[in-house]
Amino acid sequence: MPRSIRPFITRRSVLAGSLVSAVALALTACGSKGSADGSVKGIEVKDGVATITIGATPQPHVTILQWVQDNLAAGAGLSLDIKEIDDYQTPNTSLDDGSLAANFYQTPNFLKQQIEEKGYDFVSIADVHIEPMGIYTSKGYTSVDQAANGGTVVLNSDPANTARGLKLLQTAGLITLDPSVEIPSDLDVTANPKNLKLVTVDGAQVAASMADAELAVINGNYALQAGLVPSRDALVLEPGEHSPYANELVVRTADKGNEHLVKLAGLMNSPELKAYIEQTWTDGSVIPAF
């Protein structure tokens, strides 16, 4: 049961890079229309229905959005044009350039880091759900304490998720971090008793890299995509209660008061969606954040 960096390697992301480029081009080509009156890029109003172009990572984000589209959107005069995106950068670049009206995939720490690094003018308008990050292994271990000295631990490479993963490793007792650093990197590891090699790869590649490592720290959505059951398979799992890592519905700050986006935020925090999440992910891998 679950308990509740970096000699960097060359990223295994040539294919992923090509995919990112292709998705970005597709979004630019088909998603940059404004609304009928030109007020919000990524929203088109026709015959009383506002079509919102929204980008999301596959699991569980696209699944949640598709349920909202199929069950709630029409009643609010909305239609969701859902763009499935497999990386952590394109949803924000596409929101920034107007290809999307909103995105749904990121946590507050990641959003803060992106705003600071890229200068985005974004804001969250709804906390939707939590996907606990976990420490996994393919070695058959039942405890992180079984990890070999000098072994490799794979983490998500974007700074916010690297920091989140490092904090989970600290919770597991594998490393100690400088407590004065809010978003730590490998440079802030002050103790590493097992001399673990902390390696980062693209988030979508962490689960695939698990076979070559002692441990892998995997985001909840990528664990689901890899067929893992967090409550069963994780050696250590983040607690869901009072988590600072809610997945958010994010829009451009200038658009936060748009009536159609406000309606969408309401649907994303509706009792109906809460019940759907609780009934669908009964293993606790996805937890409502509202």
Name these PLM-found stretches.
Residues 132-144, 245-258:
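A bilobed periplasmic-binding-protein/Venus flytrap-type ligand-binding module shared by bacterial periplasmic
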Residues 162-170, 268-288:
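Periplasmic-binding protein-like
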Residues 43, 47-59, 78-84, 152-153:
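Short, well-ordered beta-strand elements
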Residues 26-29:
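C-terminal motif of bacterial Sec signal peptides marking the signal peptidase cleavage site
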